Amino acid sequence: MSKRTEPALFLAFLITAGLSVGGLWLLNRVSPGLIPGLSSQTAPLADGNSTNSQQKIQLTILGDTFSGYSTFRSATFQDALKESGISLRYEDEFDQAKRVTRLNQGQADLVVTTLDQFLKQKPAGKIVGLIDRTVGADAVVLNTRKYPSLKSLLDLNQVVNQARANGRSLGMTFAGDTPSEYLALVLDTKFEAFNLQDFEINKVEDASEAWKQLQDPNQNVAIAVIWEPFVTQARQQGYTVVLSSKDAPEAIVDVVIASNRLLQSQPQVISEFLEAYYRRIDSNVRDGSQLQAQIAEDGKLSASDAAAVLQGIDFFTAAEAQEWMTSGTLTRRINSTAAVLALTGRLNQVPQKPEALFTSQFIARAANNTKTLVDLVRADNPALADRLSGKGRAIAPTQKLTVSQVKAAPAIGNLQVRGEVSFGVGSADLTPAGEKTLNQLVQEINEFNTQTVAVRVIGHTSRTGSASINQTLSQQRAQVVVNYLRGKGIQHNIMAEGKGFNEPIPGISPENPRNQRTEIRLVRIN
């Protein structure tokens, strides 16, 4: 071989090697993970605002086994993230306080949790995305099988007093630091006949344990708060589902929280993470069967149980999440949730600036993608377009019921009236104080689903004067309340009912002015 050919051979070798390395790099960028070992190097939170580098960004997200978080655990979603140069590690951390501590200490970048836990635990971060609302997945179940007279919250006092007379106390069970506990707090603050202090509280690790305790004939459990698929099983076995998250569809909201560290060092990563997540959600909205299959596989559930779980979860699209963040809806939910926590001693102070707790900045790209998709499908599939826009279930009109239908509907319980619905002496004219009380009640009633909950306004008088006059006055007062609530925008089926002085408060004289009262009773209609 002549020495003249050696430089040419050497140059050819360099070109071949360069093409090989370049080809492998390009293949790895287009199809991450196709060639083992090439994508194994990760760098947590590299400096800069873009993931367009050869370093892969490693994100750690903390959550639990809730089916609403199954997308974050799915291989399909994690593979999609890798195409953006993001490697996601999902870890279960069931202790909510530890979950936030790890975020604050830099051991995690993101956390998924409920809005109430976000307010309670106060992480060093902000809400950057909304995941879902539970719409039936969580429920309060009464042990009607053991206590046949226990069919609504109105029956609690009698059952509790009977147990005490026999030297026993009744129990209540739920999974602590979960939506089940928050739903119990909602009962405690919203309904006058329910008081957590009346029960021996048994907090368990999982709803499956609460469900077992409710069924155990040797336990004196009167109430359990559980989630699907146990809610469906309880209903099928004759227990009373007195209130579910479907009745209060905005009470339990799951959120994505980004650490302040991630917000400051890698804002672009958050946008790309959310863009990939909501793209997956949009796909699931178009074809719900793949999400059901994902939930079944993730939770090792049967197809029917997975369907029950999915039926109770309403996932946010990016467009809807953005609308919540920018229209004031999320601010109102924060205020309402904080009020429940404060009233039950779980929060010392309601946030003064709730708008500072979240940002819509990082969801903008994902929302624009969803809006583009809505425009594309609107003409051919308006129902899908509505669902992608965040309407869907919410746009169904309220079914109008007759007075007799509302009156015959099974009771849930009486709302806690903070203040007095007062009238002029001997008249049906509301006082300013009475109007103020009703204005507060408008907000309370609007928390409940018009599709599943109706309202009975029941007027009572004290025993002074003739029965007929008192009957007429109580009916007139109840009707005035109904008219006032309707005038303030209440869309629920609502009816007025006068009782005169026929149902005095137990334990006080029928002539006592305290009998002059107005009950706001919620009943189940659907």
PLM segments and residue spans:
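Periplasmic peptidoglycan-binding/tethering modules of Gram-negative envelope proteins
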Residues: 365-454, 525-526
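Secondary-structure end/capping motifs
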Residues: 44, 266-350
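Periplasmic OmpA-like peptidoglycan-binding domain that tethers envelope proteins to the cell wall
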Residues: 460-526
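Short, glycine-/small- and polar/acidic-enriched structural segments
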Residues: 31-196, 202-203, 225-228, 250
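N-terminal Sec-pathway targeting helices
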Residues: 1-17, 24
